[in-house]
Amino acid sequence: MKKIWLIVLAVTGLLILTVAGFVVRDGATVTPVGEGTITLEAGTFEAFPLPQFAAKHISEDYKSYFVEVEPGIKVHVLEVGSGFPVFVQHGNPTSGFLYRKVAEELPKDRVRLIMPTMVGLGFSSKVPASSHTVANHMRWINTVLNQLQLSELVYSGQDWGGPVGMGALSLSPGLIKGAVMLNTGFGAPTRAANLSIPHAVVKIPLLGELLLEVFFPIFDGMGRLQGDPDQYTADVAELYGKPVVDSGNAKAPLAMMRMVPDGPDHPSSPAMRAVANYVESLDIPAEIVWGMRDPILALGLPGMKRFFPDAPVTETQGGHFLQEEVPAEIAVALLRVVDQVQASRGDSQ
């Protein structure tokens, strides 16, 4: 009998190790495939017809296409409008669709809104968890901007879209002419510190995978980060979550949470410090629009003011994904900055 129990325990242990190994696997590269092409001033790109569950959220005048930033790694880009380029960068775990309501508030004849989706999220390529680094994401988004042959732009970013967007621009420092900063942050902690309790918990190996990928999928809980949780509907959860889950590689949300530096020696810290130094060097028209009901980054407003001490600040009742809740306030700020940029060069319309 004792021998039987030992065999049972051994088999059980082997099964547990097998399951654990599967859960914490690095994940594979998943390359999406488009259909046809789309021609822009910068050249011809691979078109990506949107599935109905996503297409229903935007108007028919949007362009949807891929920019291949490395062999097998494609960034999905949405854009709408014509006029002065405005590059907007989302963060974790959303996609370029996060700015769709902002787009509705902007005059399409004055602004060309460019909305890339970070690798690993939305309809962009999925990559192994180990490939999610600040430096990689900066380089990938910078490659998008370069392939679109942009010579100037106004920028806005939120969550990881702050460091990644500004980081991408730091690699082509002449591009940015103005900015509207949303809930995000720059730099790295000078001592051990976690951004939030969830960030501290999910960085624990295996526990993070079990929590975010098995028991409590991150896309189902995003409403808790909003000023009005009821605005985060099942349709919106599907918009952000379905492309990631259906791809077979849903590693990005957890990997991006683990990218957040928790001290000066974190792997992300050198890149984050470099981005902060770049932001400090900027002398551009800027505004800040902040969601004061953001449970993660609301308290980061004073820090953002230090980077842009002369920027007008609009405090809102939005939560973490404030683009979903206060798009009009963001759009108005973007237009004011675009007007300032154009006026400064003498071509205000």
Where in this protein do the model-derived segments appear?
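Alpha/beta-hydrolase-fold serine-hydrolase catalytic core, especially in secreted/extracellular enzymes
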Residues: 342-349
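N-terminal Sec-pathway targeting helices
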Residues: 1-14
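Short acidic-hydrophobic surface loop/beta-edge motif
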Residues: 65-70
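C-terminal-most transmembrane helix of multi-pass membrane proteins
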Residues: 86, 331-333, 337, 345
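Flexible "cap/lid" subdomain of the alpha/beta-hydrolase fold that forms the substrate-access gate
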Residues: 15-64, 75, 98, 121-156, ...
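Catalytic histidine-centered segment of alpha/beta-hydrolase-like enzymes
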Residues: 319-331
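Conserved HGGG/HGGXW glycine-rich cap/lid loop of the alpha/beta-hydrolase fold
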Residues: 73, 78-123
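Short hydrophobic "strand-cap" motifs at the C-terminus of beta-strands
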Residues: 89-90, 289, 318-319
